[in-house]
Amino acid sequence: MEERMQKTLTNVIDLPQRDRTESKWYEGVQTFMWMTEDNIVEVTFDKEHLLEAILDPKNLNRAYKTVMRNKGCGGIDKMSCEQLLPWLLANKDSLIRSLQDGTYRPNPVRRVEIPKDNGKKRLLGIPTVVDRLVQQAINQVLTPIYERQFSRTSFGFRPKKGCHDALREAQKIVNEGYRYVVDLDLERFFDTVCHSRLIEILSRTIKDGRVVSLIHKYLRSGVINHGVFETSKEGTPQGGPLSPLLSNIMLNELDKELERRGLLYVRYADDAMIFCKSKRAAGRVRDSITEYIENKLHLKVNREKTKASNVNGVKYLGYTFSSINDYKLSVHPKSKAKMKSKLKELTSRSNGWGYEVRKRKLTEYVRGWIGYYYLASLKTFLSKMDEWLRHRIRMCIWKAWKRPKTRMENLIKCGIDAYEAHRVSYSKWRGYWRITGTPILHMAISNANLKKKGYPCLLDSYLEWHPK
């Protein structure tokens, strides 16, 4: 079925193919890397005729598959991903024609607010599915061009790079003797990107004015917030396929300035650390680079949060640095507290979840958390957390048994003597925490039994990443 849909799509978005030996826009070609689903390969096209590359049927087909794979909710028109193919069957000619002649008008994005840990909200802008398709097609052509320009120590939203690469690079720099850091904080970066400055930067590389104009239309498409249209005079709304690339293109200017000054740094999206060998040098760098960012890039630096300090205890991507002989990556205390708070939420006795739902949610969260924080040494911490988590799980099970008679029967099934089972089940002890901490409950709902029933163990999950 899926293969038949892909063949249909290829026919839907098929454009007349030009003979490359006779094509005018193929003259003066240049070779760039091209992203596929599995790798980056080199292809050849002309930067002055990028729109043709964007509208190439193979590129559009790949963009369609990416949009379908990523799913996501609909935009202001409420069109779902499943409705995209029927829409293309009916409207593909007018869509492609409007993109070619410059009459295409992107829809405003739908405002979505996501709560942040600090109590504030992250503003997302969800494009329509059709706009996501077009943005993804643009992204696939521009990414390999800009990948050649981007810095080696820029890790956010890039192929085959990620948070762990950024953390390892930061650890390496610190262990080379750069023990002081400027922890750069850009205030509401995605919401405050200067459109004119970004367009100027784009125009240096993209010589096809039609593509620059199309990107500018997306930047200025506006927002629907609670049913009210708002103009977008600045910012690259998070939520669309183009936003990560545009943010990297903007902050690549900062990367090049840092490299020009000979400074070592690591950047993941708008989260950057600049490394120095003394606190005095870090202070000078903080002041001068703040001036550059605000005056040249027209971005706002949060001066209260942008600090020059020793690297010990600085939070970066959820981790921090600690040293005995050399510097190791550790989980920041705030990240640990957030994890404990989430586990407490997942083991709440009042959420009404059954055993299977709770086990599934716990397992998903534990695997995700360990999969991200496994770079740190966590055996001692996770052993203590396992004790606490199992105690919380026992409370959930004890409450689920409800009636004293049921509790007594289940304790006996677990191998507890009938007298002890009766004593505990009908006791007037107050508090789930107290009663589930007794030796009887530990014997009945043992660690081995919990593991056998499928409840996750933090330490076991960690040891899967660190078998030694």
Located regions from the model:
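Non-catalytic, polymerase-adjacent accessory regions of viral genome-replication enzymes
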Residues: 1-89
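Right-hand nucleic-acid polymerase module
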Residues: 3, 346-407
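Amphipathic alpha-helical blocks
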Residues: 73, 83-108
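Conserved polymerase palm-domain catalytic core
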Residues: 98-113, 117, 152-313
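Nucleotide/phosphate-binding loop and acidic/charged catalytic motifs
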Residues: 138
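A conserved non-catalytic segment of reverse transcriptases
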Residues: 220, 296-367
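Extended C-terminal regions of large enzymes
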Residues: 392, 401-468
